[in-house]
Structures are given as structure tokens and as C-alpha cells.
Amino acid sequence: MSVVSLPQMLEAGVHFGHQTRRWNPKMRRYIFTDRNGIHIIDLTQTAHLLDEAYSYLREASDQGKKILFVGTKRQAAPVIAQEAKRCGMFWVNQRWLGGMLTNWDTIRTSVDQLKELETMEANGTLDLLPKKEASVTRKKLERLTKYLGGLKNMRRKPDILLVVDQRREQNAVMEARRLNIPIVSLLDTNCDPDLTDVGIPANDDAIRSIRLIVGKLADAIYEGRHGQLEDFSEEEPVPAAAPVAAVAVAVAAPAEAESEDKGEVLYSFDDEEE
């Protein structure tokens, strides 16, 4: 039985890709059709590849491997933090700082500084500082928490990178590839499947799609660490031909409402003042 059902994926809008003019031809084999100028992802393949990713992460977690969740876009950020925490892993959900992997020793120094400042805040040491110095120090603590809070307990480079929006997180992807760190990634229709080791064709823009897929991957990690979960779909297995028919029905209606976030606008975080 698949870890996610066809109705669940349809309801979450997992099948909606990008505008046809914004596709990557390498994703052709994962595309079912197009409607109203939007590519429609083949959910039969999504279900199969999600099962493979689930097994891969469950086994990796069972072996004690550490996974870093990466997703900094507005739609992904809260899901990334929530699901990484739930399964006891690490996350980056604000800005990917250059060298987070390739210059890990320097990043770890900043993480240690964050933990030191947290201790000072907890034991009241910051309250003993001059007012201006305390204010500057607290601002530094806030900034370090924002960008490095998800790495506090990560003492070494991760064994696997889990990415939402391969294109947006290209710096993280390139660093991982340089260090031969395996990548698990959602693959929207504008992505390059050659840049990931374990890919899952899916809408990486809609919040519900991100929550569904990342949630299932977090389930796999949790299961590997703690044992069997009981939250698989209880529906009967869907015959192989059914997904095609169901998707055809689902995309018969206009797709704009489900794919309004598939345009050119990208969310970015502005540099903060020191």
C-alpha cells in the first residue's frame, strides 16, 4: 500500500506543475498532460517515487544517519521547521548562508556562539550588561536564532539533504553535490532531476502539497528512529489505471485557483542590518 493515497494528493494539489513555458524538458517523463497552460504531474509516478523515498529515509534514519531539511520560501518555511522538529532532525528555513556545508567549521563556531548567548539569556547574565551592550547582544542572539536555530544540535555535516524547491535552494544543492551528500528533493516541473539522488515529482509551491509530502518524509524518518507509525491511508490500493483517469477528471476544471502561486514571483529574504 502506498504511503499516500491518490485522493490525498489530488486534494493537496500535488499534481499542479508550473506554466508550460517555464518547464525543464528533463521533467518530461513525469508529466501527464497540460491544462490551461499548466503542466500536470503524473501522480502514478509520484506515488511510486514517494514510496521509494519513504523507504530510503526510513532505512537511513534507522541506521542513525542525520537529515537536514532545507526550504526557505514563504510557503515551505513553517512546514520545514515543524516537520524537522517532529522527527528529531535539523533544518534551515530562512536563508541559506554560503558555506553552511562546505565551510561547516566556521558555521559551527557561530552555532556554538548562539548556544552560549542562549545560556547567558537563560541565567540572567545579559541583564547584568550595560543597557546598550545588552541590546546589541540580544539583537545578535535573535539573528543567530533566526538563521541557525535549526542547527543547534547538529555537530557534524548531515548525511542527507531534504530539499523543497531545488531551484531556489540551488546553493544548498551545489554544496551538497560538491561534498557527495545525497539529496532527496521535491521535483516540480521546472526542476532538474539530474541534480537529485531521490526525487519526488510534486508541486513545490502550494502549502498543502509541501505539507503532505514533507510530512510523509518526516514520518519515514520518525519511523526509522522510533518504530512503526499507524497513519498510512486505510483505503484500498488504487489500480494502476485509476490515477490517470482520476487526474483527467481533476484537471478538467480550470486550474488557476490551485496554481495561482505558480507564476514568476519569488519570495526572498532581505539582508538584515547588523
Swiss-Prot record:
Show the segment(s) annotated as Disordered: 255-274
Query: Which domain of life does the protein's organism represent?
Result: Bacteria
Against NCBIfam families, the record matches this protein to: rpsB_bact
Please state which protein family the record places this protein in.
Answer: Belongs to the universal ribosomal protein uS2 family.
**Which molecular function GO terms apply here?**
structural constituent of ribosome
Name the GO terms of the biological process aspect.
Answer: translation
Alphabetized, the UniProt keywords read: Ribonucleoprotein, Ribosomal protein
Q: Which GO terms describe its cellular component?
A: cytosolic small ribosomal subunit
Against InterPro entries, the record matches this protein to: Ribosomal_uS2, Ribosomal_uS2_bac/mit/plastid, Ribosomal_uS2_CS, Ribosomal_uS2_flav_dom_sf
Q: What is this protein called?
A: Small ribosomal subunit protein uS2
